[in-house]
Amino acid sequence: DTGGLNIKTGTGMSLMKKDMGGAANCIGLAKLVSDVGIQIDLHLLLCLVENSISKKSMRPSDIVKSREGSFVEIGDTDAEGRLILADAITYASESKPDLIVDMATLTGASRVAMGIEVPSFFCNDDDLAMKLIDSSKRTGDPLWQLPLWDNYSNQLNSEHADFKNIGNSVFGGAITAALFLQKFAKNTPWIHIDLMAWTRANKYSSYEGGEAMGIRALLDFFKRF
């Protein structure tokens, strides 16, 4: 992820090899479910994209049509992950699932709020959210709920399309990203996890690299779903 035409700095790009962490965690979760033998019908969708620069690059203010049919104005080309997630959520919804879970290294705003060790999550069903919080506590696998605060949704307003792919404020970026995705989940029960998927050396370990985050809590949650 270079950021596209809204290009990142060199420092901002330096760790982007870990930007596939959401997909990696989903693969890890699917393997856990298979190894444990939980009897659920699990469909794994991997949203894979390279965000780079070419003569075909998407431009700020371009308007694209989503799979769901709505038109999205590109406010920032570095907010590409939510575009492919939106189409995947729409695709998943077409089979009328009982639940959709997405995991993504989506926003720096979540890292600012939570640090790198605690993923944030959003959910459109309060009962499911409480069960996931309980599973997080039971497994010691941290997840922290942030609100789908509807009063921020007007930050996504567009004069030229149905909405933009990014909010017009420097504040609450993790929330507005989740509100964008919620437009595609609609009434399907849905959990969105915004994670770092990477750890740095700390007082407990000298290891630095990819990190499984939230999948133990989700495994426990699936057992009781």
What are these regions (language model features)?
Residues 2-225:
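A generic structural signal for tightly packed, nonpolar segments enriched in small/aliphatic residues
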